[in-house]
């Protein structure tokens, strides 16, 4: 049962912010602002000491709720065109999870979501080879964990980056037939899962 303590308020503010964003009631910049407000309910010094939390030598024991907010915040920074901040936040919370400060059945799945945020940040910064390498790692782990949604997201992102690298290089570094084969894999997995958004996205890109 949700009460009026800080942890519950933090949970509600995060949930409402995500819902408003996905229902197109707020823009990405507002999502960042609201998520940071939720975070500061427990990390009251975030504005002043965020660089301390994100420093390479620090591993801070964030709570599960803080990690979820930070994970969403990383995605939000990507959405509003600040991939550098997204990368810093993703690396920060991955250090916390890798140090096993938080253990739950969902920890490994959470890591994959965070790593994908990191890969998307690399994409936004035009570091396509870095993104591709990370996505291939994510795909292997997602298959092992039987994390179906992440399998299709990683596969789709892999094809996107391969295609982008080919376009920029002006040569076929990655075989086009292999890219199309991977796109078909994504399409059929998405169709089997009833994920029309991904299925339509792939169908559109396949026709290009």
Model-derived features: where do they sit?
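Flexible inter-repeat linkers and adjacent short helices
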Residues: 1-30
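Structural motif corresponding to the intra-repeat A-B loop/turn of tetratricopeptide repeats
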Residues: 23-25, 80, 118, 125, ...
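Amphipathic alpha-helical segments of tetratricopeptide repeats
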Residues: 2, 36-47, 54-55, 91-102, ...
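Structural signature of alpha-solenoid helical repeat junctions
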Residues: 4, 8, 58-65, 85, ...
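TPR-repeat structural position
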Residues: 26-28, 83, 128, 148, ...
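"A position-specific structural signal for the A-helix of alpha-solenoid helical repeats
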Residues: 11-17, 65-72, 110, 116-117, ...
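Residue at a conserved register position within TPR or TPR-like alpha-solenoid repeats
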Residues: 20-22, 77, 115, 122, ...
């Amino acid at each position: 049962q949700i009460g009026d303590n800080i942890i519950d308020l933090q949970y509600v503010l995060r949930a409402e912010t995500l819902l408003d964003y996905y229902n197109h009631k707020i823009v990405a910049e507002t999502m960042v602002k609201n998520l940071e407000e939720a975070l500061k309910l427990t990390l009251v010094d975030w504005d002043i000491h965020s660089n301390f939390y994100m420093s390479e030598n620090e591993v801070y024991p964030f709570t599960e709720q803080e990690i979820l907010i930070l994970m969403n915040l990383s995605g939000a920074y990507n959405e509003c065109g600040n991939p550098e901040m997204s990368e810093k936040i993703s690396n920060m919370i991955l250090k916390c999870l890798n140090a096993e400060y938080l253990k739950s059945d969902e920890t490994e799945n959470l890591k994959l979501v965070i790593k994908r945020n990191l890969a998307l940040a690399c994409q936004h910064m035009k570091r396509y080879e870095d993104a591709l390498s990370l996505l291939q790692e994510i795909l292997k782990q997602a298959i092992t964990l039987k994390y179906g949604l992440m399998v299709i997201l990683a596969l789709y992102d892999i094809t996107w980056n391969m295609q982008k690298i080919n376009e920029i290089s002006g040569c076929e570094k990655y075989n086009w037939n292999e890219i199309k084969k991977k796109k078909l894999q994504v399409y059929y997995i998405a169709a089997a899962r009833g994920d029309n958004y991904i299925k339509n996205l792939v169908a559109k890109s396949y026709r290009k």
